Amino acid sequence: YRKCLTFVENPLVQVMGADDIMLPNYVDWLVRAAERHPDAAIFQPGVFVIDEHGAPSHTLVERVKSFYMPSRRVPQVLRGEALAVSILRGDWLYFPSLAWRAETILGIGFREGYDVVQDMALVCDVAMQGGGLLYDPTAAFLYRRHSGSDSSWRALEGTRFGEERRFFLQMATEMGRLGWKRAARVARLHISSRLHAGSLLPRAALARNMAGVKNLGRHVVA
């Protein structure tokens, strides 16, 4: 992702995954959204999720993301502590589908030391600097989810959760300094992240992945 940012030349930026698909209306949607919502720095369109074969995907992850998405499925801009709380409660964003104002993503950049939660970290940084995120349910992107992804492997191994825990505790500290008590509390508890780890424990145990069981169990109670 950092290398991609070195090629930015235009005021709007999109960094998609290798096998994700922009729908034909994506660019037009983005340009119009940026014009209509000058207070937004990040743009999240509606997303259809597909598996490695191109079929619709309805995994537990999708159901959880749908639960945490804004309940009002109309275009809206989230900002400040409200944006931080929304994302920290449960990461409902589809990172490869996001678009950004170049001045924002280049000005803030990705935090060092994160490989899995870099999207949440950047969105939280935007929120803490006063930027807004437009959520528009207009479908414009196909996001591909398959079991062989880097984040899926890290999840079963439990290694991603050490990074998540470190991130949430860092956010709790930083948001506490801003006086964002609710956001700090949500980050400190990181309930959805713990539940995610707990849901993977049976799979890790069945696979006799004892390291994964240990890592996942630690995150559930930490």
Where on the chain are the PLM-derived regions?
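Catalytic core of nucleotide-sugar-dependent glycosyltransferases
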Residues: F67, A139-S147, S152-W180, R203, ...
